[in-house]
Curated annotation (Swiss-Prot):
Similarity annotation: Belongs to the Frog skin active peptide (FSAP) family. Septenin subfamily.
Protein name: Septenin 1e
Cysteine disulfide partners in this protein: none
The organism's place on the tree of life at top rank: Eukaryota
């Protein structure tokens, strides 16, 4: 699932940092 960080969606399977 996509995680949301800094107001930007992460790519599927990748978590935003």
């Amino acid at each position: 699932t996509d995680a949301v960080a800094n107001g930007v969606h992460a790519i599927s399977g990748v978590v935003d940092t």
